[in-house]
């Protein structure tokens, strides 16, 4: 390294001493939303574990008769999350329809309600093939006994 190269770590505080500054107060886990930018809503869905929520976003698209919302991630497949989705759709989207669902990956908190949301609101799902088929495979029961190829794998 050259003698005059800047020390990129000089301004980084020691671990455990830094504090995070958020530009917005988080939404309550009660179907409240925070508009983080025009047409971008942030909401939280509850999770019954130490990490007690998942962040979910709604993206407004289009104008006039084509306007609607895309969901990014779903929350858990629980009755509480389903009830919150019903309330969000009924009260927080300016009367506009859902247009689609994007699941970022297959984890149960990000895609747990994919089937329910797509069926309930007749919207398409966008997800990579790899994530979709991994999610499907994890949800399937293996035949008894397991096929030889799986045993050898």
What is the meaning of each model-derived region?
Residues 16-17, 71, 98-100:
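A short, structure-level motif marking secondary-structure boundaries and short turns
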Residues 23-26, 38-41, 108:
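Short amphipathic alpha-helical surface micro-motifs
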Residues 1, 40, 51, 65, ...:
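Generic low-polarity alpha-helical segments
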Residues 20, 44, 77, 102-103:
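A generic structural signal for short
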Residues 30-96:
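Conserved beta-strand hairpin/beta-sheet module of binuclear metal-dependent hydrolase folds
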Residues 1-32, 139-148:
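Accessory terminal helices/loops
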């Amino acid at each position: 390294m050259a003698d005059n190269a800047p020390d990129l770590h000089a301004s980084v505080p020691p671990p455990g001493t830094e504090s995070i500054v958020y530009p917005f107060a988080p939404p309550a886990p009660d179907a409240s939303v925070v508009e983080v930018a025009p047409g971008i809503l942030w909401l939280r869905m509850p999770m019954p574990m130490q990490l007690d929520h998942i962040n979910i976003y709604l993206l407004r698209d289009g104008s006039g008769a084509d306007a609607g919302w895309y969901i990014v991630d779903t929350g858990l497949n629980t009755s509480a999350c389903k009830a919150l989705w019903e309330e969000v759709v009924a009260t927080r989207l300016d009367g506009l329809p859902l247009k689609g669902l994007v699941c970022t990956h297959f984890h149960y908190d990000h895609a747990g309600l994919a089937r329910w949301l797509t069926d309930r609101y007749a919207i398409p799902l966008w997800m990579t093939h790899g994530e979709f088929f991994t999610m499907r495979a994890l949800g399937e029961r293996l035949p008894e006994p397991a096929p030889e190829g799986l045993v050898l794998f």
